[in-house]
Every structure is written in C-alpha cells, then in structure tokens.
C-alpha cells in the first residue's frame, strides 16, 4: 500500500435530522401564562458502526419547558451524521466518535431545536455549548464504576 492509502482519513459523508418531535400538551392555555418557563435540557450521544470504517453518530437532545409544573413544550431531536474514519488507531476511534463527531453535529441539533420551538409560537431557546470531552470522560467514569460493581454499561460502545 502507498503512503497515501495509509494516511489517517476522516470524512463527513452525511449530516441529517434523524428524528424530531414537538409536543405542546397544554396549548393554547399555556400561552396565557405570564411566568417564564423553567427549562430542562438533556443531551446524549450514541455511536454505531455501520460498516468497516463507517460510523453513525447520533446526538440526541430533549428540551422540556414547564410553567408551574405544566409542560409548555417538549422537544426531542436526534441529529445524526455518517462518518468515514480510516487508518486511525483503534484506541482513538471511540474518543473521535464520542468527542469530535458530536462537536460537529451539535450546532445542527441546536439550530433544529431552536427553530422548532420558535415555530411552535414560543420565544427561542438557545442551547449553550457543550463540552463533549467532559461528557465523554464522565461516561467513561460511569462505565468503569458499573463494571467494578459487576453491572453492564449503558449506551453503545464501539468494538
């Protein structure tokens, strides 16, 4: 093989909105509320090997806004990407899929969530940046702790 064929290769094949759901269980009455909603945000990352050197990474986000325990809206979205990753050492694949790829996908997720909230008639909510390296390290610590306790880790790992 030539040196070019052995060079590390990282390519985004496709970025797409895999799933989007918006619920407004208390509309239209919730629009009459004057109080600002309390907003909860959850983010998760999943990775799946589709083929040799091809991975699907999904960043899932859930935004729930409540006014006095009444749900104003609930948005669930999954932003996905298909990445071609070749000639990368095996021990670097998992961090690449857990840190670099989600960092690429998150701005798309944030935009889609903000757009759907605005289109639903609510003031925009802009999600803060996420440190995916810290999130990845936290997940590794949780997996290590679960393994020490004899439990199976949650989520998807790449092998």
Swiss-Prot record:
One of the proteins required for the normal export of preproteins out of the cell cytoplasm. It is a molecular chaperone that binds to a subset of precursor proteins, maintaining them in a translocation-competent state. It also specifically binds to its receptor SecA. Homotetramer, a dimer of dimers. One homotetramer interacts with 1 SecA dimer. One of its GO terms (cellular component) is cytoplasm. It holds the Pfam family SecB. Belongs to the SecB family. It comes from Burkholderia mallei (strain ATCC 23344). Keywords: Chaperone, Cytoplasm, Protein transport, Translocation, Transport. It is found in: Cytoplasm. This is Protein-export protein SecB. One of its GO terms (biological process) is protein folding. Gene3D superfamilies: SecB-like. InterPro entries: SecB, SecB-like_sf. Coiled coil: none annotated. The keyword rRNA-binding does not apply. Its main location: cytoplasm. One of its GO terms (molecular function) is unfolded protein binding.
